[in-house]
Design a protein with these regions (language model features):
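N-terminal recruitment modules of adaptor/scaffold proteins
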Residues: 1-55
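Intrinsic disorder/low-complexity detector
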Residues: 1-6, 79-88
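Short acidic, Gly/Pro-enriched loop/turn segments at secondary-structure junctions
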Residues: 52, 69-84
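Phosphoinositide-dependent membrane-docking surfaces
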Residues: 59-69
């Protein structure tokens, strides 16, 4: 599975117990979002405030995502439903 497929799988399988908000990091910018919709190769992110150009929605290709920051105060164990596990 390549990186783009991993990001797509993460967004497709985002659990209801974890708020659909965060900050997507691309090589060009950091994009805060409060919700999203997915497609085969793209994700549309919804901002709570417009950017400097007035845009509230941003469409990003999965292969352009470098990282995802999550502001959630949930304990790490809650993220196991996203496929994460403690090291052995």
């Amino acid at each position: 599975m390549n990186t783009a497929e991993s990001w797509r799988a993460l967004f497709e399988n985002w659990p209801d117990a974890i708020p659909r908000q965060g900050i997507v990091i691309t090589p060009q910018e950091s994009i805060p979002f409060i919700n999203y919709l997915i497609s085969g190769s793209l994700v549309i992110l919804e901002r709570d405030k417009p950017d400097t150009l007035g845009a509230r929605k941003v469409i990003v290709s999965y292969d352009n995502i470098v990282a995802l920051k999550l502001p959630s105060p949930l304990e790490l164990v809650k993220f196991q439903v996203m496929g994460f596990q403690p090291p052995f």
